[in-house]
């Protein structure tokens, strides 16, 4: 079971995802499921440029995921914005982070993929810490046992 976590800090998680459970609630739920042997992990996406794409945030999410029993973390160090969703996102940016819309427009224009200037460094930090803590950066997929022909007698 995957849990989306993009902010280690509850105050920022509530700001970026109004109406969704705070990150600490997600980690508590993950820990409860992992303790029962359920395969759990984190989808750490999107990391919004200029908001939550910091080394401190990434490291804190990885450490909290480890503590909660996560088996894997799948990251995306940026955000994708299609036409239509971009306008909605920009309006939400202006409400939640006044002045940031102009920076997004200047940095990313109408690009679909919007990656912050430190995305490569964040990816390195993420992969090194996951390796150190023994957290996979890929998800194991369920593979059913191969079918066998039944005999009639």
Positions of predicted regions on the chain:
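C-terminal accessory regions of radical SAM enzymes
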Residues: 84-87, 92-153
């Amino acid at each position: 079971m995957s849990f989306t976590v993009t902010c280690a800090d509850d105050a920022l998680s509530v700001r970026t995802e109004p109406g969704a459970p705070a990150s600490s609630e997600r980690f508590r739920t993950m820990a409860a499921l992992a303790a029962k042997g359920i395969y759990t992990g984190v989808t750490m996406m999107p990391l919004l440029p200029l908001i939550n794409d910091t080394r401190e945030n990434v490291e804190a999410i990885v450490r909290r995921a480890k503590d909660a029993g996560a088996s894997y973390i799948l990251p995306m160090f940026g955000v994708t914005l299609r036409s239509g969703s971009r306008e909605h996102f920009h309006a939400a940016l202006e409400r939640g982070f006044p002045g940031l819309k102009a920076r997004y427009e200047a940095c990313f224009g109408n690009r679909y993929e919007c990656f912050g200037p430190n995305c490569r460094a964040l990816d390195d930090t993420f992969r090194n810490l996951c390796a150190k803590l023994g957290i996979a950066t890929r998800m194991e997929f369920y593979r059913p046992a191969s079918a066998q022909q039944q005999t009639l007698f």
